[in-house]
């Protein structure tokens, strides 16, 4: 971070100003929770929407939103603008879907990043969709690609890139964008972790020619590095507990503080 690191992200709002959306975002119903417009959708609706509009969505981005990103947005106006500045913010976290239902949106269903990846990969050969993977580590990406090619025969992987963990220089960034655009992907899956991946997508809105989707742990799930919770835990909103047991050191502090803030501000104060 620091001053020197602001290069790539400083242009977020300039980039967005130049980006001209080809679809009407108002057609996507939303429920504002802690200032973030959470899309009132379910998986079937989203898949149909993507299939119908994918060529009009080049250069836009989708945020995969959960309690953590929503609480961070509530406390950080810049990040809130990033969450609200894309095509939509989908309810990856069950608490968001439950809160929206309590607020009078019964049709909303949890739509997780890994599930979305899986469904899009399933439909890709029929549509001829091309995929680009940006982020994570070389090891994770190699494992993930091997597994995807095995599980989804015919899946077109147009390209992959593992950026360094430091901020890129403007020159490096321009090269990264050129590589993505040369590959002509329909979907650009971004695995930099929140909030970094959402800021990256906003900074590249209109510059990257593909639909960017920030999937964080999605790369880890597909590489097999992180196992997903059993289905019964997913159904009972206990996936967070399963992940906590796998990575207690990193996640305990985050879950404890953000979950409490969410319950207090969203559930009790109805922000």
Predicted regions and their residues:
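Conserved beta-alpha
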Residues: 97-183
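A short helix->loop->beta-strand "cap" motif at the edges of active sites that frequently abuts
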Residues: 59, 129, 208-210
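N-terminal nucleotide/polyanion-binding subdomain common to many enzyme families
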Residues: 12, 16-115
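Short, flexible loop segments at boundaries between secondary-structure elements
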Residues: 162-168, 210-246
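Proline-aspartate-enriched helix->loop->beta-strand connector
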Residues: 180-189, 193-194
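Short gly/pro/ser/thr-enriched loop/turn and capping motifs at secondary-structure boundaries
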Residues: 96-98, 196, 218-223
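A short, gly/pro- and small-residue-rich
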Residues: 77-85, 198-217
């Amino acid at each position: 971070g620091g001053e020197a690191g602001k290069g790539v992200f400083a242009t977020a709002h300039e980039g967005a100003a130049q980006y001209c959306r080809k679809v009407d975002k108002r057609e996507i119903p939303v429920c504002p929770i802690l200032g973030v417009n959470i899309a009132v959708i379910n998986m079937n609706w989203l898949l149909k929407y993507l299939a119908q509009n994918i060529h009009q969505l080049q250069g836009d981005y989708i945020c995969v939103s959960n309690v953590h990103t929503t609480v961070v947005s509530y406390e950080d106006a810049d990040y809130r603008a990033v969450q609200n500045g894309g095509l939509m913010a989908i309810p990856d976290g069950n608490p968001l879907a439950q809160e929206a239902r309590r607020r009078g949106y019964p049709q909303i269903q949890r739509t997780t990043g890994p599930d979305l990846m899986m469904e899009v990969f399933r439909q890709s050969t029929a549509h001829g969709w091309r995929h680009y993977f940006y982020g994570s580590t070389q090891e994770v990406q190699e494992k993930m690609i091997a597994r995807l090619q095995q599980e989804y025969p015919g899946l077109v992987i147009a390209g992959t890139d593992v950026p360094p963990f430091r901020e890129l220089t403007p020159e490096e960034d321009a090269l990264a964008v050129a590589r993505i655009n040369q590959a002509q992907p329909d979907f650009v899956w971004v695995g930099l972790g929140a909030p970094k991946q959402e800021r990256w997508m906003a900074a590249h809105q209109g510059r990257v020619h593909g639909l960017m989707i920030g999937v964080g742990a999605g790369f880890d799930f597909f590489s097999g590095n992180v196992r997903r919770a059993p289905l019964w835990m997913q159904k009972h909103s206990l996936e967070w507990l399963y992940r906590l047991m796998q990575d207690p050191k990193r996640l305990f502090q985050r879950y404890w503080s953000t979950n409490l803030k969410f319950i207090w501000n969203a559930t009790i104060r109805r922000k």
